[in-house]
Amino acid sequence: NTSMLIADIVGITGSFSTAYGAHTGIATLPLKYYGNKDQKEKYLNGLVSGELKGAYCLTEPDSGSDANSGKSRAILSEDKSKYIINGQKMWISNGGFADLFIVFAKIDNDKNLTAFIVEKGLDGINMNPEEDKLGIKGSSTRQIFFNDVEIPSTNILGNREEGFKIALNVLNIGRIKLGAGVLGGCRGVIDHSINYSKERIQFNLPIASFGAIKYKLSNMIVKTFSCESICYRAGDDIEQKIKEFQADGKNLNESELTAIELFSVECAICKIYGSEILDYVVDEGVQIYGGMGYSEEAPMARPYRDARISRIYEGTNEINRMLIVGTLLKKSMKNEINLFKKAMEVIKDGKLKKIHYSSDNHFKSSYDLVNSLKDCFLYIFGKAAMHFNDKIKSEQEVMMNIADVIISIYVLESTLKRCEKIYLNNKNKIMIEISKASIYSNISIIRHHSIESVISYMDNNDAKKSIDFINSCTEFENFNIKEVNRNIANYFLEKKSYSLFNNFK
């Protein structure tokens, strides 16, 4: 949670956030978790103090999302004293100033990658000039070439062919931190947008008084609030699980890695949702600024450019969507979770849902809705698994639809939990409004992707029955969303800010 909070705070800096995140995350954590005693003594203290700067060398020209297909090779010398590395890495953050590289390559004809610790000053390391990027221009991004680079055989990190596992485990951490890392940028754009909309006069009125602008501000705020909710919920769940594992006798490193792997789906959700709401927020920020938003003189251009990379690094959002559903399928087949059994129960029952809303018990009614939405997920998940069997992984459109349903349910439930907690603490009615806005938007997403999923492979009669069930699961109270959005916008326009430490009093 500490590292997530720091990522949250520095996220507004864009380029510095990228450099900081690459160094403290993917460049340092492999050594923390997989380095031996000698490696940690030699390198880890310097990385932690900042005396050494690190970079992570995984991506290659022909291996991006398919990271384990990398062509870089390491050959053990005849006397077994050193490895000789050859290969090319690209899009390496911090490449221009890093002192230490975590390099992934295959030994001989191994199937899987191995990780190596490589010092920058060695002969045979060459770099291209800095990449001319769309955004995060203040960060260093280089191509790095390794030509017969000799490293001591003691600089193998972890075990042979363990590199892909190291890469995945470290990326899980990077994903949840990226979710938190977008928040500072979102808040900064929201604050600029609030203040500009109050100052900008058109038709003799501040544009903040217009419904179209209030709609934008409300959605920017609610989505950011929801992103905070999922990140700190997932972070706390991981922290609690780490403590449980430690109480059972596992050491800290083992406890952290096991807990993070257990919550890999939540890490992917945070990454996907965070990066996409950042794009949404900065885009609406430019729109609120109008023509000025398109100028480099205004505070919108840089966030707009910087935001785009977040949907690509730490695994593209498409790959992460596949990971969410693929992980659940894998765990279900191993009987680690009983999703298949629950899905079959929902499908067999097949009764249409009817959720009764009570304004006197808003949150209880809302949780009843969440349970109904979970049945909707189980239904489409089970139907797809039954239809495609082991071929479902080739049906990426269906998997992405299912992933979007999962994401929206997690986002909505997390938002409701946080709204309820704050509301019970101080009875601030804005929490009711935020929860209503989240319900409205997430129901629409869930209904859309659920229907799109089933009609992509069902015949007309089966599709109609499924759509009836989906509609019953997603039918809820018709809130006056116009007034809800206006109330939310007015609340924060009066405050003149959306702050991380806002106590909502």
Please tell me what each predicted stretch does:
Residues 1-20, 32, 49, 57-62, ...:
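Active-site beta-strand/loop segments that form the cofactor-binding cradle
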Residues 26, 169, 281, 291-363, ...:
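Glycine-rich phosphate/cofactor-binding loops in nucleotide/flavin-utilizing enzymes
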Residues 57, 219-282:
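Gly/Pro-rich turn-and-neighbor structural signature
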Residues 81-127:
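A short core secondary-structure module
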Residues 350-505:
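C-terminal amphipathic alpha-helical interaction region
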